[in-house]
Amino acid sequence: MKDTKLQMLTTRFEELKMSEDELFDSFYGKLNEVVIGKFNLGEKTEDSKVVRKILRSLPESFHAKVITIEKTKDLDEIKIQELIGSLQTYELSLPS
């Protein structure tokens, strides 16, 4: 049962994407739910994996910001909260 739940959460983690009309906080809430679920079943997801997942899962409207982050930050060292703050600030600058 535990293995089945873990496999379902792993699949959800891999497939989760942010849609163009979704707010970043909503997307991150869903992603964080999956990460916490996996942790509760005994599997820790490395921060660098979560950072890369977030950057891969953002819609086209975030493309310029993703490129900037990838070029200027060490993705193995950036803190998830730092990334979240940066993306939330960027989202506020997007036309609504």
Which residues fall in each region the model found?
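Intrinsically disordered, low-complexity linkers and tails enriched in Lys/Ser/Pro/Gly that lie
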Residues: 1-96
